[in-house]
Amino acid sequence: TLMQDIINGRCGWCGTDELYVKYHDEEWGKPVTDDKTLFEFLVLESAQAGLSWITILKKREGYRKAFCNFDAAQVAQMTDEDVERLMHFDGIVKNRLKIKSTITNAKLFLAIQKEFGSFYNYTLSFFPNRNPIINHFQSLSEIPVSSPESEAMSKDMKKRGFKFFGATICYAHLQASGF
């Protein structure tokens, strides 16, 4: 079907929404090595849990504003008062657990940076020979919802205390950031 095939070099899942097409063509699957962008994707992918990606893409600038331009160190310093303020901010999905988890995840993200030198290095540690995997899927039906790498990474992240980052979300995160 139209939504499942790769059409004109573009994955069918992005449909025709201009924002989605721009995201697909300019960002999705491009290798990301800088931790600030990896943190941004982590925040957005976590927020997406149970929702459609386009919902989060449409609120991306709201998330940028709400979460200190995706500065993990600043987000990690946010307080319960900030959570209350964000519960009244229309620019994001107003889910208390997700807002609080973003702050918790920021603290854990910083701990991983300290332990591994960068979140990028941490991510690479789950891949054979520390190299991203290049897939050549032809249709949506071929794409799995997780991978051995996303299973291992999400299990480790869960053990560390990360929230809203299971194997499926982790796989989407890895795909989006070029792993």
Where do the PLM segments sit?
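HhH-family (HhH-GPD) DNA N-glycosylase catalytic core used in base-excision repair
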Residues: T1-F179
